[in-house]
Each structure stands twice: as structure tokens, then as C-alpha cells.
Amino acid sequence: MNLLEQYSQDPQFARLLAQEELILEVTETLCALLEKEQVSRAELARRLGKSKGFVSQLLNGGRNLTLRTLADVLSVLGYKLKLQPEKTDGQGGRGRMVT
């Protein structure tokens, strides 16, 4: 059993891992949408009425992304969010975000 498998047996670690995986998936999805829509971070900040620093922190995972903020970002890009939870084996893991 490798170290990750050992840690995955710890429920607290599994929850933290699931949180970090979700943050990564959301921020990667937002970055992909920006690229697809050819919207710069500066333009996103302008559309949101926020600073460029705010957007950078948001997309780098350094700022807690609330559901309201996520909805705002998706809205100004012309998208909405549909969640599709997936059952895990009880050791963490993530569902899927569908835009």
C-alpha cells in the first residue's frame, strides 16, 4: 500500500482531498471557459466589477470561491452550472461539474 492509499484510509484526509480536487476541477473549468470564449482575466474582472487581483486569486485557487461568485463568473461568460454528483468509494474523490 502506497502513502496516498494509507492517507486515503483517514476520513479527514479523504475529505480534504475531495475539497482540493473540487477546487482544482472548478478553477480548471473556469480557465478553460475563459480560453474558449477568448476572455482575458482583465476582461473577466471588468465584467464582474472586480479587481484583476480578485480574479487572479479566484482562478489560482487562493480565494474561497462561493457558489454566488461561481454563478456570477459563469453568468458573465454566458454559462450556467449543472452539478452531477458521482458516488465515490467512500475514500474521497469528486463528482463532475458539467457546464
Predicted segment positions?
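The alpha-helix within a helix-turn-helix
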Residues: 34, 45, 74
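Residues that mark the N-terminal boundary/hinge immediately upstream of a DNA-recognition element
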Residues: 40, 66-69
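DNA major-groove recognition helix of helix-turn-helix/homeodomain DNA-binding modules
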Residues: 68-84
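Short alpha-helical DNA-recognition segment
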Residues: 38-54
